[in-house]
Amino acid sequence: MASRLLARSKALALALSRADAAAPGPAAGVQWLRTLSSLPRDPAAAASPAPAPRQPAVGSPLGLSKIPGYEQTSRLSGTQVLPRWFSTGTSNGSSAQQEGATRKVMAFSPLEASIAKPRKGPLTSESWKVKQTELLTRSTYYMIPTLLLVSKNSISTSLLVASVFHQVYMFYKEILLDYVHHDITRKWVFIYFKILLIIMAKETVVYFDLF
């Protein structure tokens, strides 16, 4: 503490002597006040090295001026924190606005866009077809024993025949998928096999006079 006071008094005396020598007269008071206000409060802190300049922001992988960060988004399921790249850009306007223009921050989050807008493509439609086929196969699987027990008319017996042929078709379809690898050949095999089963089911219904 004493060393700080001694250093400050020496600096003040030196400033006073310089002000008296350089600006005599009424202007000396003003110059003295300016010199006094420019003195550092802590001479030890003034002697310390200046802080290192701030490092620039990390650039994005695409080489654009973007800053990585996180932003909270509120949804029905709860609050989610999504990673974002915040790109900075100068606002457009008149020449007066461009001189003192501020940098705007625009948020970019591919993950949020994929959550908000589900993608629709060939894979989505194919998965929907697979789900429909699985549901139909499971339904006919449970319909066969049920109709065997409660079938009392031609309509229920026709449904029973259709369920049995559908199960036969799905069984052979799995076998053909394993052994027929060419797409076009597999497609036509399925078509003709389905036609064959439809004809057999029709002949069965007609033969037993179910309609």
From Swiss-Prot:
Residues 1-36 form a transit peptide. GO terms for biological process: mitochondrial electron transport, succinate to ubiquinone; tricarboxylic acid cycle. It is a single-pass membrane protein. InterPro entries: SDH4 (IPR044963). GO terms for cellular component: mitochondrial inner membrane; respiratory chain complex II (succinate dehydrogenase). Pathway: Carbohydrate metabolism; tricarboxylic acid cycle. Keywords: Electron transport, Heme, Iron, Membrane, Metal-binding, Mitochondrion, Mitochondrion inner membrane, Transit peptide, Transmembrane, Transmembrane helix, Transport, Tricarboxylic acid cycle. Heme binds at residue 166. A ubiquinone binds at residue 179. This is Succinate dehydrogenase subunit 4, mitochondrial. It comes from Oryza sativa subsp. japonica. The lineage of its organism: Eukaryota, Viridiplantae, Streptophyta, Embryophyta, Tracheophyta. The gene is SDH4.
